[in-house]
Structures are given as structure tokens and as C-alpha cells.
Amino acid sequence: MNILRGDNLNRDTIVALSTPPGIGAIAIIRISGNKSLELTEKTIKNKKINIKTLEERRINHGYFYDENGEIIDEIMFVYFKSPRSYTGEDMVEIYCHGGILVTNKIIDTLLKLGARLAENGEFTRRAFLNGKIDLIKAESILQIIEAKSEKSLKLALDNLKGKLSNEIEYLRSSLINVLSKIEVSIDYGDDIDVPKEEILNDLINVQSFLKEKIKHADKGLHISTGVTMAIVGKPNVGKSTLLNRLLVEDRAIVTDIPGTTRDVIKGELKIKGVHFIISDTAGIRMTEDKVEKIGIEKALNEAKKSDVILFLLDATTGFTNEDEYIYNLIKDCNFIPVWNKIDIAEKVDKDIVFLRNSVVISAETGRGMRELEEKILESVKVLVEDGELSHVTSKRQLEYLKRVEYNIIKAINSLKKNMPLDIISIDIRNGLEQLDELMGRNFTEDLLDNIFSNFCVGK
């Protein structure tokens, strides 16, 4: 059951902790809804302030009391009057001392007096429903919070300021203009005849704009969500040691027993400002062990969907049949051959053509790691390098743009075949509907649930 459906959204006053739980200097508690000021009057006291006539956007001092009149904490608080607030509703922010007991007692008091604990992302959801932001800006707020690199933060900030939203509005107005020309031709064809060539050129321009956005979307997505990288190789080649070396922490178990890693282990790192999500996978070999087979299957799936693979080889054994077996499985992927254990190897076998551009390292000592990082960056340069960006930062956004392009291409093809204008207008209207869903003009509760459930409770 979703308690946000129906009239509950407008009636309920919600409360939540907006800072991370735990011990800290200051904690922030948010209240939003039409009873925000009433709850403030019941719980916060300051003889010099009349809560009923509280000046908005001004920081005030006071004491927070529970429902029995017992003091909980000395606080500061700010009142934001509707609609000039984050949510578009009456809001109060309470700044209390950080600590689990203090914040819990304040929130418990507000709940007892009629507030409801906010759901994930409900403050931002209300901001959207009250017309303060569109869905793209709502997504950008979450991306700012989760940003792992300077580039991803900049993209998210650009979209919060309206970069992608403005481009979508341009597309929308262009399609409305084309639709108007078609409707004029249909309704007043005897008096006003808009040339089909003009309509066709307008649609081609829209499709070209969309094509560019979609073409460069991968770059925005990689910057926003991170570049994926997998370590593959035969058992006991040093994959877990390399993962720990790259992450500068012990995330994976390191032993001399082949096949120790059976599940995919993931970590995150930055190399010169580029955010990577790296996976350590099970050792790949021919085996009859059912459990190990499952791990190997997971390893291959993880590797093949990654942006770059580190193909780890053992410098002490040279290129083996097991290595050749793995090579044949990943040869069509973007991979970097990496010779490990150079600290204990006598020589490195670089005679094989596809290994001539390999990197030589010791995951144990750290030798060659700088060269490996440079090689990794070079292999994904096209995905993250500076240049044209589409500011498409989520798969949802990309999917909607592809749907719009599909409808515009249909309209263009129909126009070239001299199909009736009223048929062509259907495809254009479908494209407009997709743009409106992308921005949030049209939405379903399931769509909102999917987006805002990723937020923390206090946002």
C-alpha cells in the first residue's frame, strides 16, 4: 500500500531526519505540510517570538519540548512559508544537537502530535507534485547527492539548473509547431496549404537534434554512473590481490587455494577523476564442480557487460591453455592483457601478437600500477573524455528519447510515402506524450515510486 496516493499527500504533515543518523555536531529535522507551523507552536518555545506570526526564512533560537512539557534540546529553527519552500508547502527546519537520542525524541514527539514519518524521497516528490521542479531536476538532485567525481557533479548541477529540461522544452515546442502546421493544412487546406517539404524539413531537424543527444548519451551515463571494469583470469592468478591493490583496501579474500572467489566482489575507485566500478570475478577454468560453474558463469556475464576487462595472466607460468580458453571467450570485448607476479617471474612471454601491448605488474608489491592505470584510462577515453555531452544522465531519460526518435522517424517515413497528414500527426502526438512523461507532465504513481524510492528518507 502506498500512503502517498489520493488526498493523503495534501493532508499529511511529514517529518524526517535530513542528515545522516548518528553522533555529530548538528542534525537537521524537516517538517513539511499544512500543520508545520501548528506543530512548531506546540513544541518550540521562545518568550521573545510569537510562533503564529513567525517571520519566514529567518533563523530563530528556541527550546524544543516534548508532549509532556519536558525540554529535549536547545535548537535553532527556520520557517519557510508556502509556496516559497523546497516542497512548495509550509516547512520548518529544526537544527538540533547531533545525536541518536536527541533526534529520535524530537521526531517521536512530532509523530505523537500528528505528523507522519516521511517516505523515501517524499520531500522531493512533493516538490515535484507542487510544480517546484520537473522529473529531470528531481533525478539531478539524487545524482548530486550520489556524485562520485567532479564531472558527474557538474553534469548533475547543470541539469538542476535546467540544461536538459530546456533542451526537452525546445524539442517539445518544435513538435508542437510542426503539429500546428499539420492541423492548419488539415482544417484549412483549401485556403492555407503548408508545403509538405516544410513539414518534412522541420521533422528532420528534430530527428537530427535527437540523434545527437542519443549519440552522446553514453558519455553522460558513464560519467554519471561510473565506468564498469572487470578482472578476469584463471584461478589463483592474483585477481583478488589486484582488486585490493586498486582499491587500497582488503575487499577480497586472498589465499593460495584456487577458486577461492566464487561470487562477484565489487568496489569503487577513482583514477584521475574518472569513477570506476570494478568487479573481481571467479577464476575461469574447465570444471565439473557445480558451484564453481555458477561462479564462472557469473564471471563471464559480468565481464562481457563491462566497459573494460583486465585480463590477468601469470608471468610465472606464461601463456597457458587455460589463458587461451579465456581469451577466446573475451576476444571481442575491450580488454587489457595484464601480466601479474612479475616480482617472482624470470621472464614475460610477449611473443603472442595480442599480448604485445600488455602491462606488466606485481599486484603484491605495486610495481607497474601507474602504467596500468594509464592503460585503463586510455582504453575508456572515448567514454569519458571532454567534448560533446548530451546531459542525459539516466537510463530512463535515454529510453524516453529513443521512443521519441522512433515516433519521429515513423512520421518522416510516412511523410515521404505521402501518407495522410492525420496519420502522421498520430506519431508526432505520441512523441509529444513521451516528452511529457520524461519531464513529468504525465506520470503514473509507479513511475514516481520507482524514481523517489532511491532517495533517502529526509530528501
From Swiss-Prot:
InterPro entries (UniProt xref): G_TrmE (IPR031168), GTP-bd (IPR006073), GTP-bd_TrmE_N (IPR018948), GTPase_MnmE (IPR004520), MnmE_dom2 (IPR027368), MnmE_helical (IPR025867), P-loop_NTPase (IPR027417), Small_GTP-bd (IPR005225)
EC number(s) per entry: 3.6.-.-
Residues annotated as domain TrmE-type G: 226-381
Residue sites binding GTP per the record: 236-241, 255-261, 280-283
Subunit structure as annotated in this protein's UniProt entry: Homodimer. Heterotetramer of two MnmE and two MnmG subunits.
Cofactor: K(+)
Classification via SUPFAM superfamilies: P-loop containing nucleoside triphosphate hydrolases (SSF52540)
Protein residues bound to (6S)-5-formyl-5,6,7,8-tetrahydrofolate: R30, E93, K132, K459
Principal location: cytoplasm
Gene: mnmE
UniProt protein name: tRNA modification GTPase MnmE
Domain of life the protein comes from: Bacteria
Enzyme class: hydrolase
Any single biological process term in GO: tRNA methylation
Function, as annotated: Exhibits a very high intrinsic GTPase hydrolysis rate. Involved in the addition of a carboxymethylaminomethyl (cmnm) group at the wobble position (U34) of certain tRNAs, forming tRNA-cmnm(5)s(2)U34.
Membrane-spanning segments: none
Co-factor binding comment: Binds 1 potassium ion per subunit.
GO cellular component, one term: cytosol
GO molecular function, one term: metal ion binding
Binding site for Mg(2+): S240, T261
